[in-house]
Amino acid sequence: MTNTQPGSALPDEIAKFNRLAAEWWDPAGPMAPLHAMNPLRTGWVDSHVPERGRLLDVGCGAGLAAEAFARMGFDVLGIDAAADPIAAATAHAEDAGLSLAYRVATAEALVAEGMRFPVVTALEVIEHVTDPAQFLALLSRLLEPGGSLFISTLNRTLRSLAVGKIGAEYIARLLPAGTHEWRRFITPAELDRAARPAGLRLVATRGMSYDLRERTWRGSADLSVNYLAMLRLA
């Protein structure tokens, strides 16, 4: 799929993640950092959503977060513009006996269908889209009034360049080289400014720090590299 509408994933990003689909569920493979990060990401969402209901996971990839949300009791729909990860996600969920739905689709497609959800997540996605402000506007149109949007991404700081880009991809080799473009990282202040015209308000943030020796993630007050954000639709 090569959708180039504003806010959509870039075609080269879609191709990149299609290539990774077969190895997505390997905890020792190229997606190992996401496997390690997943409990922190999904647990933070869980702690902010007391009610169990419908949840849309935008840019779900092969379903790491979507499956975790389904196990928590959410009624999950995962969408991704890349077909191969969706195929891997569907097969993995079937093997695990989990009841959740996946579609090869963009946020634009669901907006056109008039779909709305009380909870929308876009984890490690916004740094891969053409226009973050337009992407946030699309996500706001997928939320029910008062709904919550959860973003997980990387801050654009010198530390994130050193740690999240150069260190992770070229020194520690935690991620395949070229996974991220540092110039596409977004600061929390930029996220807040981009979200406000869409009626979204930033209500909570949490930093995520990686322990290289333990190969584990922990929550922290440090937002300088990886961080989580919760936004609410007025």
Regions from the PLM with identified roles:
Residues M1-W25:
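N-terminal, positively charged/glycine-rich alpha-helical extensions of SAM-dependent methyltransferases
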Residues W25, A168-A177:
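Short glycine/proline- and charge-enriched loop/turn segments
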Residues D26-V45:
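Conserved SAM-binding loop and adjacent beta-strand
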Residues T42-V49, G53-L158, P188, A229-L231:
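Conserved SAM-binding loop
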Residues F150-A172:
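Conserved class I S-adenosyl-L-methionine
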Residues R173-E190:
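Acceptor-substrate binding/catalytic loop of class I
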Residues R201-D211:
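Conserved S-adenosyl-L-methionine
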Residues T216-A234:
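Core SAM-dependent methyltransferase catalytic element
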